[in-house]
Swiss-Prot record:
NCBIfam families linked to this entry: ispE
This protein's name: 4-diphosphocytidyl-2-C-methyl-D-erythritol kinase
Molecular function via GO: 4-(cytidine 5'-diphospho)-2-C-methyl-D-erythritol kinase activity; ATP binding
UniProt record similarity statement: Belongs to the GHMP kinase family. IspE subfamily.
């Protein structure tokens, strides 16, 4: 087939712990990652001439090398030059539903969809692991976005251990339209404030990762104890974001005052989310928080936990 349409789900963090610094300048992390049904749609087709074209229905999405989806196609063309020459160029059309710069891996999931789509279109037959290794060269969230579901992510987040799927959990997401938080700023500020707590030696970092692996959050997921999952939500980056952006703290408090399993900021933000056990509860929470906050700049979405990552659109 010379074209594919793919569904590219967003993701939230259920747990994000910063363990310490890595020799490559990144942070050593332990995270629980979760796919959600809020998803972009990606269409990939061959266009004959050896070039890469990106189109998007959102005016602020770059259509060149600044777009990680473009870089994913470029990486594949360099890794498989003979196949690229045989099949010709690639046109990538992105229909954007995941908000930009929101901490929901919108760019990473687009890149993951391009890797999966080109593997299918070029009939490469790459394994899941091979696709994830390519994804890790593009960004820390890309490997997770390929397979999705529920997973423990360590190192930069690219070393993944699958966890049992969490079905029947709904998520209410809220984001201020004109607020974005730079991921490098969040990690840099965290380092400045809490760097003294960092673990640097390899063995201690390893035992910290293992502590999370065998810790209460992973146990709650394995046991499908949704109440406990909600209570154990944890994100170290809230320590810098909520003090810098008081409106996020106010939003978090508004969610926490409702009938929710738990509430937290996703990734480096600024999206705040709350978990509920039903769609009707999610709708009630959205309505109540929307009324309480009364801010036209605040956007809301309702999604469900997704048990997979990139899939072919039917």
């Amino acid at each position: 087939m010379r074209s594919y349409s793919l569904i590219a789900p967003g993701k939230i963090n259920l747990y994000l712990e910063i363990i310490g610094d890595r020799p490559d300048g990144y942070h050593e992390l332990a995270m629980v990652l979760q796919s959600i049904s809020l998803a972009d749609k990606i269409h990939i087709r061959s266009i004959g001439i050896e070039t890469i074209v990106v189109r998007c229905d959102h005016p602020l999405v770059p259509q060149d090398v600044d777009n990680i989806a473009y870089r994913a196609a470029s990486l594949m063309s360099k890794e498989f030059p003979e196949v690229f020459a045989r099949y010709g160029g690639v046109e990538i059309t992105i229909n954007k539903y995941i908000p930009m710069a929101a901490g929901l891996a919108g760019g990473s999931t687009n890149a993951a969809a391009v890797l999966v789509g080109l593997d299918l279109m070029w009939e490469l037959g790459l394994t899941h692991r091979e696709l994830q290794e390519l994804g890790a060269r593009l960004g820390s969230d890309v490997p997770f976005c390929i397979g999705g579901g529920t997973a423990l992510g360590t190192r930069r987040g690219e070393i993944l251990s699958p966890l049992p799927n969490l079905d029947h959990i709904y998520v209410v997401l809220a984001k201020y339209k004109n607020l974005s938080i730079s991921t490098p700023w969040a990690y840099k500020t965290y380092r400045q404030k809490f760097g003294h707590t960092y673990i640097s030696d390899t063995e201690s970092q390893k035992s910290s990762r293992q502590r999370v692996h065998s810790g209460p959050m992973v146990s709650a997921i394995v046991e499908h104890n949704y109440k406990e999952v909600g209570e154990l939500l944890h994100n170290d980056l809230e320590k810098v974001a909520l003090s810098e952006y008081p409106q996020l703290l106010k939003l978090r408090e508004a969610f926490a005052s409702e009938n929710v399993l738990g509430t937290m900021m996703s990734g480096s933000g600024p999206t705040m989310f709350a978990l509920t056990e039903s769609q009707s509860q999610a709708e009630e929470v959205r309505a109540a928080v929307k009324e309480k906050m009364a801010d036209p700049d605040l956007e809301f979405w309702i999604a469900q936990f997704n048990s997979s990552g990139i899939s072919i659109a039917h």
